[in-house]
Each structure stands twice: as C-alpha cells, then as structure tokens.
C-alpha cells in the first residue's frame, strides 16, 4: 500500500456496514485512515524507493527515526560524511516490539561510535535515507480504520452543488471533512482506541 493510500477500501466498509457503497465510501475510509495516522503519529503504508529525511539524536547513542521497513537502501550521513551500515544497530530486532511481530525499525543505535549530540544549543541534523513505512498494514489498524469510518458514515455531511455546463445542469456531491476532529474520532471510539493505542509513538525528531 503506497504512502497516502487508505488502509482499507470502500468495499471493506460496505461489507462492515452490510450496505452498498454509496459513492462516498472511498472518501470516508481515506479520512478515517488520516484520523488513525494523526492519533498514532505513524504512517502505516510504505515507500518502495528510499528517500532522505533528517533527524536529531536524543542522546549519544540513540537516534529515533520515522518507521522504515527494510535495511535495504539504508544510508546514514552525519555532517555530510557517510557512515557504514555496520556503524548502526537498527531496532527493534527481528521486527518484534512488546512481544508482537511485524514491526518496522524506528530506532538507530550506534555501534562503537556516537551521534553528534549536545545539551547546549542546537543538535546537528543527521540524514537518514531509507524505505519508509511498514511492510504491511497491521490488522488492528485496518479494523480501527473501519471503526472510525463507520462513525464518519453515521454522521456524514455532504455538500451538493449544481452548475450549468454547456447548458446542462451538473450536480456534484462532496464529502465535508474539514470540520471533523479526525484524531478525536479515534479516541472517541472505544473499539478504535483500544486497537490503535498500542501503535501510538512519541514523535521522532524528523524533518521530512
């Protein structure tokens, strides 16, 4: 699933609701996916091409980064100098975190080196090039997305506009989402909250 895609489909929501897709289900699951991202502070899709992002170390040995799903293509540059991949220890090991498999890497620990770090002034930016995201969207995240989508669908607000195009009246309908508290949709839904809370993280020091 590419970055920016919904974690479930409109047809998945149709099955959950046991009703046909009314034409807005794809928009609803997209909004629900963004709600889950805001609540967890994570992006569960993945990129297939490595891209550079910048981060700051939190101490001499640990660099929290955005989630990345493979060490293939991993490059670390400090002050313009490339480090060897063996200079860092990506964690969690074996994709296991809190006893659960399937996790990406999100911490880089140094091996016989230290990150540029100071408690005085601004810390140096460290450039990490990686394939960001998760190998696969976790099932609890898919279900949390459907929980939120179900709530959105129940309280849906639709704008209807009509305009003349070449002498023909054309009516358009659009889903109104700008007034929604997206992150609040997760915390306000007990099922979604319980499914998503294990994936909440502190924000890394990244600059996309």
Q: Which residue ranges define each predicted feature?
A:
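Divalent metal-cofactor coordination and adjacent catalytic microenvironments
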Residues: 1-208
